Swiss-Prot record:
The name this protein goes by in its record: Chaperone protein dnaK
Gene: dnaK
Organism taxonomic ancestry: Eukaryota, Sar, Stramenopiles, Ochrophyta, Bacillariophyta
Superkingdom, taxonomy of origin: Eukaryota
Originating organism: Thalassiosira pseudonana
Protein location: Plastid, Chloroplast
Function per UniProt: Acts as a chaperone.
Cross-referenced InterPro entries: ATPase_NBD, Chaperone_DnaK, Heat_shock_70_CS, HSP70_C_sf, HSP70_peptide-bd_sf, Hsp_70_fam
Length: 602
């Protein structure tokens, strides 16, 4: 079977890893880095950029540079309305209430799944190059607290990217695989995973090849992005108080502020104070305005104190659900770049009574764990048993707007459970099954995963028909629901797809479009490389001509070469690629003999 890779599809950065020689290995990307920014951009020339290249141009192309999209995947527009207001790019609601990301350079709206798919495509392309073989299958990680909609949407993103997602695995569980792969002695570990946009806590028993999740808790709207936003708000308010200008109206200024806030946050993990320096942040009739602001670690912590406090509740909840106190935890493993914040490390130590284990790289450990899971599925790693849990309770709406739970949170998956229900009125011939996920008793307090109808129920007094509802959660944590009327045998079976916001046909259409753009992007890359090569070749030939190093070249030949260079330069300046190719080939034919004659033989 082809190599199966593990992908940590992160909010801020993404990582891909694979099993090499029996060991998990992080794959270096085309730019030479082990992490790839989860950023996608479309330039004014409609060129697609992903990762580091997209990040570099984000200030000058802020409205077409899309980052932190993972926070929107599998969500409805109303769920993220406040958060979307703080972004330099536009997030809109379509006619179905779904999230769309507006791309003005293409005059097109993208779903979050499509943007995430471009990040996955980049990771897969880098993996193919590194491994020297085709890659068509992957294990992708998600936050443990992702609901069914978000998990299904992640699978859809993989499909749009053109890969088969063999398994969805929870990020803390993946981290535990990486940490505990060689552990023989049983340990109870707490994984504290604070990334760019999400926060999870999982408690697991690890040892002798068995990884059993005891409990999980989290917050899918808490991460490093929120710390950055707290700093941006402080800078904006301070600047407005001093200068009377609101910088949030300026897209480029907002992007510069965001980048400066992230940089300052990272610096304060190592030093006690830093300076945020943003010259020419804006201008008015009196001239240019600048920001030069000192920020201490103490001030940063006070600005983010409410965010730090929010990290406390899931830890306490996970311990309670696992029926453990501090003494029951042997090791604490930190995951995610945001765990480098000293105040976070201090909080973890105070809650667990343990100094965090720093033997794993918090940026890479999840991808390594995903690669181990990929290796298990590909048969490259054996003797590993992974027992994960569902993070949230699942149930159906019953009379009075109440949620009746069929599967409780922290139930080991895969799992299948059934319960009998009946009709609420005499001679009722159909029932609507409203599937919910969450912990509240009332329907309105939970996430709606979808509705479907069971038709053809024989007429009978209310309460007599027996309708068996079965919930089946697979190893990816994705739910299928079956409703069956026992007397007639009428049955309706659905995988909860509506919650992912994309239909199967939409996913297929997006895959076709992504593949079409992949061809266009390849052509654009080839054109760009040709321009670079042709320009460099012109420079080299002109240098040789001017220094008299063109070998035995007649005056007529020199004149012909100069004319071709002139034609090629004109083609380059007008971006006439057909003419560039023709003139470049002509120039090489004319000059190769003379250039080679100036190079001594080896």
């Amino acid at each position: 079977m082809n190599k199966v890779v593990g992908i940590d599809l992160g909010t801020t950065n993404s990582v891909v890893a694979a099993i090499e020689g029996g060991q998990p290995t992080v794959i270096t990307n085309a730019e030479g880095f082990r992490t790839t920014p989860s950023i996608v951009a479309y330039t004014k020339k409609q060129e697609l950029l992903v990762g580091q290249l997209a990040k570099r141009q984000s200030v000058v192309n802020a409205e077409n540079t899309f980052f932190s999209v993972k926070r929107f995947i599998g969500c409805k527009a109303d769920e993220i309305s406040e958060e979307s207001k703080e972004l330099p790019y536009k997030v809109i609601k379509d006619s179905n209430g779904n999230i769309k990301i507006k791309c003005s350079s293409l005059n097109k709206d993208f779903s979050p799944e499509e943007i995430s798919a471009q990040v996955i495509r980049k990771l897969i392309a880098d993996a193919k190059e590194y491994l020297g073989q085709d890659v068509t299958k992957a294990v992708i990680t998600v936050p443990a607290y992702f609901n069914d909609s978000q998990r299904q949407a992640t699978v859809d993103a993989g499909k749009i990217a053109g890969i088969e997602v063999l398994r969805i695995i929870n990020e803390p569980t993946a981290a535990s695989l990486a940490y505990g792969l060689d552990k023989k002695q049983n340990e109870t570990i707490l994984v504290f995973d604070l990334g760019g946009g999400t926060f999870d806590v999982s408690i697991l028993e690890v040892g002798d090849g068995i990884f059993e999740v005891l409990s999980t808790a989290g917050d899918t709207n808490l991460g490093g992005d929120d710390f950055d936003k707290a700093l941006v708000r402080w800078l904006v308010e301070d600047f407005e108080a001093k200068e009377g200008t609101n910088l949030t109206k300026d897209i480029q200024a907002l992007q510069r502020l965001t980048e400066a806030a992230e940089k300052a946050k990272m610096e304060l993990s190592n030093v006690e104070k830093t300076t945020i320096n943003l010259p020419f942040i804006t201008a008015d009739k009196n001239g240019p305005k600048h920001i030069q602001q000192e920020l201490t670690r103490e001030k940063f912590e006070s600005l983010c104190q409410d965010l730090i406090n929010r990290c406390r509740i899931p830890v306490e909840k996970a311990l309670k659900d696992a029926k453990l106190d501090q003494s029951g935890i042997n090791e604490v493993v930190l995951v995610g770049g945001s765990t480098r914040i000293p105040a976070i490390q201090q909080l973890v130590e105070s809650l667990t009574g343990k100094k965090p284990n720093k033997s794993v790289n918090p940026d890479e450990v999840v991808a390594i764990g995903a690669a181990i899971q990929a290796g298990i599925l590909a048969g490259e790693i054996t003797d590993i048993l992974l027992l994960d849990v569902t993070p949230l309770s699942l149930g159906v709406e019953t009379v009075g707007g109440i949620m009746t739970k069929l599967i409780s949170r922290n139930t080991t998956i895969p799992v299948k459970k059934s319960e009998l229900f009946s009709t609420a009125a005499d001679n009722q011939t159909n029932v609507e099954i409203h599937v919910l996920q969450g912990e509240r008793e009332v329907v309105s307090g939970n996430k709606s995963l979808g509705n479907f109808k069971l038709e053809g129920i024989p007429q009978a007094p209310k309460g007599k028909p027996q309708i068996e509802v079965t919930f089946d959660i697979n190893v990816d944590g994705i739910l299928s629901v079956t409703a069956k009327e026992n007397e007639s045998g009428k049955e309706q079976n659905v995988t909860i797809q509506g919650a992912s916001n994309l239909s199967e046909s939409e996913v297929n259409d997006m895959l076709e479009e992504a593949e079409k753009y992949a061809v266009i992007d390849k052509e654009q890359k080839e054109k760009s490389e040709m321009v670079v090569s042709a320009t460099a070749y012109c420079d080299e030939v002109e240098k040789k001509l001017n220094s008299g190093e063109m070998g035995e070249c007649t005056t007529e030949e020199e004149e012909e070469i100069k004319n071709v260079i002139k034609t090629l330069r004109e083609a380059l300046s007008s971006a006439n690629y057909a003419s560039i190719k023709e003139s470049f080939e002509q120039l090489r034919t004319l000059t190769e003999v003379h250039l080679n004659s100036t190079n001594p033989a080896n």
